[in-house]
Design a protein with these regions (language model features):
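Alpha-helical structural elements of signaling/regulatory helical domains
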Residues: 31, 97-100, 114, 132-136, ...
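Conserved FAD/dinucleotide-binding core of flavoprotein oxidoreductases
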Residues: 1-47
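Conserved mid-domain beta->alpha element of the FAD-binding
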Residues: 44-125
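Short, structured helix-loop boundary elements
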Residues: 19, 102-105, 137
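C-terminal auxiliary extensions adjacent to catalytic cores
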Residues: 142-168
């Protein structure tokens, strides 16, 4: 099982919970009590920060990297694995048609990189809204997020990976 619960990096109490402190999370989010109480416990629970992995290039010569090695992102949007799978499928399609491997890899990255980069940026932004928002204006976030969630431009931005249709 995998559960992703985030807290600000500055929240030492949230980060250092080993094991997971159920009561702290229920106190912070009482509306989710029923879900927190159903979480299975595991003796190896731990907190780790997430990092975006951004490479200047996904390939060199006849070698490439895919998935988290090329563009790791925090699971804020739940898109990392899907993006990696789509990248691999597109890569296989291009390699099946193109004999020049370095050229195929360049074509693949040119095709996939724009939507991957945008997905990564939106994942970071979504996480930052949740964990880096200034405490002094949390009430603003609480009013802003419901409005944003109804805006088409926000929804399209969050769905960039879901809506991606590979050209290859």
């Amino acid at each position: 099982h995998y559960v992703f619960l985030c807290c600000p990096e500055s929240d030492l109490q949230g980060r250092m919970q080993q094991p997971f402190n159920l009561e702290t999370w229920i106190e912070s989010h009482p509306q989710y009590r029923q879900y927190f109480e159903r979480l299975p416990r595991h003796p190896q629970e731990y907190w780790r920060p997430f990092y975006n992995v951004t490479c200047s290039s996904w390939s060199k010569g006849r070698v490439c990297i895919v998935g988290d090695a090329a563009h790791g992102m925090a699971p804020n949007l739940g898109q990392g694995a899907g993006v990696a799978i789509v990248n691999a499928v597109v890569l296989s399609r291009i390699l099946a048609k193109e004999r020049d491997v370095p050229a195929a890899l360049r074509k693949w990255e040119a095709s996939e990189r724009p939507y991957v980069d945008k997905t990564q940026r939106m994942s970071y932004l979504y996480g930052a809204v949740g964990t880096r928002w200034p405490r002094s204006i949390l009430d603003v976030r609480s009013k802003l997020l419901p409005l944003l969630s109804r805006a088409d431009i926000w929804q399209r931005s969050l769905r960039v990976a879901l809506d991606h249709k590979p050209a290859v």
